[in-house]
From Swiss-Prot:
Chief location category: cytoplasm
Cellular component, GO, one term: cytoplasmic stress granule
GO biological process: cellular response to arsenite ion; positive regulation of intracellular protein transport; stress granule disassembly
Signal peptide bounds: none
Zn finger residue spans: AN1-type: 4-52, 58-106
GO molecular function: proteasome binding; zinc ion binding
N-acetylalanine: residues carrying this PTM: 2
Positions of region (ubiquitin-like): 160-260
Binding site for Zn(2+) 3: 64, 69, 87, 90
Protein name: AN1-type zinc finger protein 1
Primary role: Plays a role in the regulation of cytoplasmic stress granules (SGs) turnover. SGs are dynamic and transient cytoplasmic ribonucleoprotein assemblies important for cellular protein homeostasis when protein production is suspended after acute exogenous stress. Associates with SGs and is involved in the efficient and specific arsenite-induced clearance process of SGs through the recruitment of the ubiquitin-selective ATPase VCP and the 26S proteasome.
Length: 268
């Protein structure tokens, strides 16, 4: 009686075992026994191709230079100051502890003096109203905070203890006059701007040198807050602070503009 021609021989040279239920490799289409069915066990030539492809793909992404950060981006995000590459989370100077970060104490001192001069230049009833408004802003913020907590948009994953709430007045000409939002108190001003722009679906060209930049401005003085400062820094200030539950302005300014004009018009 003739032997039935069933099964096939394993294609591994030193094996050649006949298997009645042979395995076909999905990559090289070779036929193998149970022992040699994996790509590694039969030395599949496609393994080398895949490994080379993975190595090539690694070169098309950009690693973050910040210590202990393993994030990679598909496009280069280069800090214009230290000229190193970072992920989106660490792209601002304060977030990656930039070696070129300068503490703008002289400029801030000059700015505070300018704010004081502007206020002092106001006389009579106008100046009186300004000071009265500043005095009552903390109380007003506490009253508004409860309402903001019910309606504000933000990152829902943030712990309640880290949230800070603002009624954000949007740039002139926007579809909405203002929008309630919450942020992490440890975020830099620059990061808060990016987040607010995303929530309000605003054009954000802050990474372009020639375009007008989105800036967060103080509701009382109109001062554009420095991008590298943190929100908690301004909450803790003794002179002209921000208040949790208070108002803040988001507006487009030129690079040379350090103040938002006509802040009263945003509240009308």
């Amino acid at each position: 009686m003739a032997e039935l021609d069933i099964g096939q021989h394993c294609q591994v040279e030193h094996c050649r075992q006949r298997d009645f239920l042979p395995f076909v490799c999905d990559d090289c289409s070779g036929i193998f026994c149970l022992e040699h069915r994996s790509r590694e066990s039969h030395g599949c030539p496609e393994v080398t191709v895949i490994n080379e492809r993975l190595k090539t793909d690694q070169h098309t992404s950009y690693p973050c230079s910040f210590k202990d950060c393993a994030e990679r981006e598909l496009v280069a995000v280069i800090c214009p100051y230290c000229e190193k590459n970072f992920c989106l989370r660490h792209r601002h100077q304060s977030d990656h502890e930039c070696e070129k970060l300068e503490i703008p104490k002289p400029r801030m001192a000059a700015t505070q003096k300018l704010v004081k001069d502007i206020i002092d230049s106001k006389t009579g009833e106008t100046a009186s109203k300004r000071w009265k408004g500043a005095k009552n802003s903390e109380t007003a913020a506490k009253v508004a905070l409860m309402k903001l907590k019910m309606h504000a948009d933000g990152d829902k994953s943030l712990p309640q203890t880290e949230r800070i709430y603002f009624q954000v007045f949007l740039p002139k000409g926007s579809k909405e006059k203002s929008k309630p939002m919450f942020f992490c108190h440890r975020w830099s001003i620059g990061k808060a701007i990016d987040f607010a722009a995303s929530l309000a679906r605003l054009k954000n060209d802050n990474n372009k040198f020639t375009a007008k930049k989105l800036r967060l401005c103080h509701i009382t003085s109109g001062e554009a807050l420095p991008l590298d400062h943190t929100l908690e820094t301004w909450i803790a200030k003794e002179d002209c602070p921000l208040y949790n539950g208070g108002n803040i302005i988001l507006e487009y300014l030129n690079d040379e503009e350090q103040f938002c004009k006509n802040v009263e018009s945003y509240l009308e």
